[in-house]
């Protein structure tokens, strides 16, 4: 797979850093469909860091695999801060990971609305210690591939940031 150089570099940095610190990472992906864990496992030595990756495209998968509350999805929708946070927490709970990152968004070309346009992505990273970061990105209607790659970049940045939070 040919990843953009900056994504490859971010993934390598995380694998090196987590390896040195004996940390494990898991992912939960909706709009990226496994691209985040794909970029990370492209790096040699990633098997000592990556515990698992959930691809929870449907609401049912978010509920069954990650324990996202049906009420959260009903009240806030799949693409929301609340859902991203529950996805990240559920990933930590349902894995052996020290840190988890979760993404949910609208990659387009359809599925957008005035309140939730194409290019809206919610990302959350959680630590087993209770640390949490959320980021709302509005990438705009850049096209499906560009939105998905931009989400991978932001997710990797969020993981690196949380893993080094004071």
What are these regions (language model features)?
Residues 1-166:
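Short alpha-helical segments enriched in small residues
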């Amino acid at each position: 797979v040919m990843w953009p150089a900056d994504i490859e570099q971010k993934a390598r940095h995380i694998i090196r850093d987590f390896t040195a610190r004996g940390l494990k990472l898991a992912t939960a992906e909706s709009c990226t469909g496994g691209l985040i864990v794909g970029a990370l496992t492209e790096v040699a030595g990633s098997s000592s860091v990556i515990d698992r990756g959930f691809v929870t495209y449907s609401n049912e998968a978010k509920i069954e695999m990650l324990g996202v509350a049906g009420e959260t999805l009903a009240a806030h929708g799949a693409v929301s801060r609340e859902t991203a946070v529950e996805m990240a927490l559920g990933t930590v709970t349902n894995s052996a990971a020290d840190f988890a990152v979760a993404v949910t968004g609208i990659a387009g070309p359809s599925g957008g609305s005035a309140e939730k346009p194409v290019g809206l992505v919610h990302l959350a990273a959680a630590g087993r210690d209770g640390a949490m970061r959320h980021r709302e990105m509005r990438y705009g209607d850049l096209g499906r591939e560009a939105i998905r790659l931009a989400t991978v970049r932001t997710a990797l940045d969020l993981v690196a940031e949380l893993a080094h939070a004071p």
